[in-house]
Curated annotation (Swiss-Prot):
This is Large ribosomal subunit protein bL28B. HAMAP family: Ribosomal_bL28. Belongs to the bacterial ribosomal protein bL28 family. Gene3D superfamilies: Ribosomal protein L28/L24. Pfam families: Ribosomal_L28 (PF00830). Keywords: Ribonucleoprotein, Ribosomal protein. The gene is rpmB2. NCBIfam families: L28.
Amino acid sequence: MSAHCMLTGARPGFGNRISHSHRRTSRRFDPNIQTKRYWLPSENRHVRLRLSTKGIRTVDSIGVEAAVARIRARGVRI
């Protein structure tokens, strides 16, 4: 599965791992993706969302209905 947030669109960042002697090798900074299950009252069912921790706080703030509407507006099928 891809490491990106369905709500915020957070994706991995890239950079360098730097050793003590300053040799550089590529590395990935993955977002903290969590799978959360929310109850969607309008559809009378649960939905499983892959969200970053910032996305989880956004759902807590705006509500699951508005969050699902934003995700669907991005073209993601739930």
